[in-house]
C-alpha cells in the first residue's frame, strides 16, 4: 500500500550512505535528524500521542489493519529531513518482553507498566518462550502487517524488549529483586542468563520480519543500521553497585552485543555513571546514548 510521506528512493540512498559511513567512522560531520509534524486535529504539539497511543492501549481484538490505519495518518503527517528517515515503532510499552512472559500489562494515559501475575519465590520462577502468548502474537501481527503494508517505504522498528534485570523486576517487582540480589544471588544469575537467551530469540524472530522490507533495522530510539542494531539498556542498573552490574548485567550486554552488528547502550541517569568504564570496555558496543 502506498503511503504519502514525501520520502523517495534518493532520500533513502542518502540516509543509508550517511549512516553506513557513520558506523564505519568515515562520516566527516555529525548526523543531523530533523522531523516536522503537521498539526493533527485534537493532538497538541509535543503530546506523547504525536505518533499515536501505544499499540497495547487498544483492545487485543482491535483488527491490526485498523490499528495501522490509525498510525498511517500520523506517519503521513510527518516529514523527515537530513539524516532522519520514516520509521514506525510498534510501541507496546518499555520492556514488553515481561508481557511475553505473562506479566500483567497495565496502561494509563501516558505510561505502560507491568506487574507479576502472582507472587512466587524466585526459585520457582521459570520463564519460558510461549509462542501463543497474546502480547507476543500481537507484536508479531502488527510488525508483519506493517512490513507487508508499507514495504520499503517505512523502516519498521523492533519493539522495546527491555533489559534482562528490567524484565526480571517486572516478573518479581523491583523491591523483591533488590532483596533477591542480596538473598538469592545465584537465582538472580540463573534468571538473568535465561532472560538473555529469551531476548535473543525474540529479537531474531522479529528481525526475520523487519529485514524483509530491506530498509535495515532501527529500535525504539533514533538510530538506524544497514544490519542488526538495537538500543540495549538496564534501567534497573541505576540502583545497583558496579560489582552487581559486572555480575548480573554486563554479561547480558556483552552477549547481546555479540549478536548485533551495531549495538548501543541507553545510559539512563547519573546513577549509571559508576558502570561506564565497564561498558566502554566492551569492544562490540558501538556507542552510548547519554540521558
Feature roles, as predicted:
Residues 87-123:
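A contiguous, low-structure linker/loop signature
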Residues 1-44, 52, 57, 70, ...:
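Active-site loop segments of alpha/beta catalytic cores
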Amino acid at each position: 500500500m502506498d503511503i504519502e510521506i514525501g520520502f523517495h528512493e534518493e532520500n533513502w540512498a542518502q540516509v543509508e550512505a550517511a549512516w553506513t559511513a557513520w558506523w564505519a567512522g568515515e562520516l566527516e560531520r555529525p548526523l543531523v535528524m530533523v522531523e516536522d509534524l503537521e498539526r493533527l486535529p485534537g493532538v497538541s504539539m509535543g503530546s506523547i500521542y504525536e505518533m499515536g497511543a501505544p499499540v497495547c492501549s487498544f483492545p487485543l481484538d482491535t483488527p491490526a489493519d485498523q490499528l495501522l490505519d490509525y498510525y498511517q495518518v500520523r506517519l503521513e503527517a510527518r516529514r523527515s529531513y537530513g539524516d532522519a528517515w520514516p520509521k514506525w515503532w510498534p510501541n507496546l510499552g518499555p520492556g514488553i518482553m515481561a508481557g511475553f512472559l505473562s506479566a500483567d500489562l497495565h496502561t494509563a494515559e501516558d505510561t505502560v507498566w507491568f506487574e507479576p501475575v502472582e507472587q512466587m519465590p524466585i526459585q520457582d520462577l521459570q520463564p519460558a518462550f510461549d509462542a501463543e502468548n497474546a502480547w507476543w502474537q500481537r507484536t508479531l501481527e502488527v510488525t508483519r502487517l506493517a512490513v507487508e503494508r508499507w514495504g520499503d517505504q517505512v523502516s519498521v522498528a523492533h519493539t522495546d524488549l527491555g533489559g534482562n534485570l528490567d524484565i526480571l523486576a517486572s516478573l518479581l517487582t523491583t523491591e523483591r529483586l533488590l532483596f533477591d540480589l542480596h538473598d538469592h544471588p545465584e537465582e538472580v544469575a540463573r534468571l538473568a542468563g535465561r532472560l538473555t537467551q529469551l531476548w535473543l530469540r525474540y529479537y531474531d524472530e522479529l528481525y526475520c520480519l523487519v529485514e524483509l522490507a530491506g530498509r535495515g533495522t532501527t529500535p525504539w530510539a533514533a538510530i538506524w543500521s544497514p544490519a542488526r542494531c538495537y538500543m540495549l539498556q538496564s534501567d534497573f542498573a541505576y540502583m545497583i553497585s558496579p560489582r552487581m552490574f559486572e555480575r548480573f548485567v554486563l554479561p547480558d550486554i556483552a552477549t547481546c552485543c555479540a549478536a548485533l552488528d551495531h549495538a548501543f547502550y541507553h545510559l539512563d541517569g547519573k546513577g549509571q555513571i559508576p558502570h561506564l568504564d565497564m561498558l566502554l570496555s566492551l569492544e562490540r558496543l558501538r556507542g552510548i546514548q547519554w540521558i
